[in-house]
């Protein structure tokens, strides 16, 4: 844990990032008020020069070695700035924006200056040991960050595929046609279709449908290309720890190559000390509510990785289908029985939480979830 050094004075920096400008708030030892410096967005040379200048002036004034600790909010800029500053000897923290404690007034002022000064106060409190003021993001390595690209790109392509298919169905539905033509026999099926009032498909609509078909075919080809790249990466790095976990998850019946890759690259590549940490990271822990004589759990926090959370909810439903003899599936049936609706949806989240913990233990220790069926062979190790 990084704390304020009481021997060597420390300069605290908070960087408010935007596309056009960066606002740097600096708290220099010996000065009461923070100093604000505005530089062009992305001008790292100016930022490093500013840091060096602040260090040099503080060192001359105090005749001591000056260290620098900075922070900025996680967002669209990613983590490259963190790596750059770290490489230049600056201790850098990335703040989780939604975790910062704020004033709960109905209307709050919002300016870059207030945000930068607020981050500066949060950073100072965090370095003093008050970790309730905000949460810090664990910065992935460049390799870990790049490994997520494949399954995230596939997710976007699948969404694009669904959008195109829904658009084709919607256009046909406006003409009273409820059947979508097959891609394999597109021309023949489209020529045979008739509108609800007996006409052929209008010329411009036919042209738009043909263009949508070409987009759909290209999207399907890209999905296959991304999946092949994913499979090839697992084959070329069989000793890699992440690839080993993907292969292990793929052995469990009901978990496919894509789910195994998503869970490993998004969750299991990290180290967790206990089950509460991993459930909190995915955001499927219930939020306690205790006041006076009332003490109950409310909805899940949803404060973690949304992609991993969605995957676990989907996997929980699939677990009931493909692992009906497991202890987790039996627990779900005993708890829910024949109930449906809201009760069943609440219980599936609890099942997802238990399943996540069981899979985490499996990838770390090799202990198979109780009653789960394991595939005899792995046809595709990815």
Regions found by a protein language model. Give the residues of each.
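Short glycine-rich, Thr/Ser-proximal phosphate-binding strand/loop in the N-terminal lobe
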Residues: 19-46
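Gly/Thr-rich phosphate-binding beta-strand-loop-beta motif of the actin/hexokinase/Hsp70
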Residues: 2-28, 119
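Low-complexity, acidic/Ser/Thr- and charged residue-rich accessory regions of DNA metabolism proteins
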Residues: 293, 332-382
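Short alpha-helix plus adjacent loop in nuclease-associated cores
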Residues: 93-136, 190-192, 294-303
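Phosphate-backbone recognition surface of nucleic-acid-processing proteins
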Residues: 245-251, 257-340, 344, 379-380
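Glycine-rich, often acidic, oxyanion-interacting loops/wings at catalytic, nucleic-acid
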Residues: 146-248, 376
């Amino acid at each position: 844990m990084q704390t304020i050094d009481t021997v060597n004075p420390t300069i605290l920096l908070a960087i408010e990032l935007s596309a056009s400008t960066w606002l740097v708030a600096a708290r220099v030892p010996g000065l009461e008020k923070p100093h604000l410096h505005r530089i062009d967005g992305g001008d790292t040379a100016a930022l490093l020069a500013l840091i060096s200048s602040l260090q040099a002036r503080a060192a001359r004034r105090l005749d001591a070695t000056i260290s620098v600790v900075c922070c900025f909010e996680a967002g669209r800029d990613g983590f490259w700035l963190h790596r750059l500053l770290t490489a230049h000897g600056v201790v850098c923290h990335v703040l989780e924006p939604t975790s910062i404690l704020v004033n709960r007034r109905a209307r709050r002022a919002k300016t870059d200056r207030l945000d930068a000064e607020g981050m500066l106060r949060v950073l100072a409190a965090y370095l003093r040991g008050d970790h309730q003021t905000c949460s810090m993001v664990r910065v992935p390595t460049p390799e870990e960050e790049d490994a997520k690209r494949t399954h995230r790109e596939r997710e976007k392509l699948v969404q694009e595929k669904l959008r195109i298919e829904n658009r084709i169905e919607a256009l046909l539905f406006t003409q009273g046609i409820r059947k979508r033509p097959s891609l394999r026999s597109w021309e023949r099926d489209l020529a045979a279709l008739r509108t609800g009032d007996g006409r052929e498909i209008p010329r411009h609509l036919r042209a738009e449908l043909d263009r949508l078909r070409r987009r759909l075919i290209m999207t399907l080809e890209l999905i296959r290309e991304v999946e092949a790249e994913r499979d090839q990466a697992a084959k070329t790095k069989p000793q890699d720890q992440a690839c080993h976990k993907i292969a292990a998850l793929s052995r469990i019946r009901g978990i496919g190559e894509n789910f195994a890759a998503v869970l490993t690259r998004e969750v299991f590549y990290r180290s967790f000390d206990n089950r509460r940490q991993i459930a909190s990271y995915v955001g499927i822990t219930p939020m306690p509510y205790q006041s006076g004589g009332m003490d109950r759990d409310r909805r899940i926090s949803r404060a973690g990785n949304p992609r991993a959370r969605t995957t676990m909810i989907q996997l929980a439903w699939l677990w009931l289908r493909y692992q009906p003899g497991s202890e987790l599936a039996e627990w779900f049936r005993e708890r829910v029985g024949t109930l449906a609706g809201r009760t069943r949806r609440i219980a599936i989240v609890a099942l997802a939480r238990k399943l996540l913990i069981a899979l985490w233990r499996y990838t770390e220790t090799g202990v198979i979830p109780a009653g789960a069926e394991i595939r005899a062979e792995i046809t595709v190790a990815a």
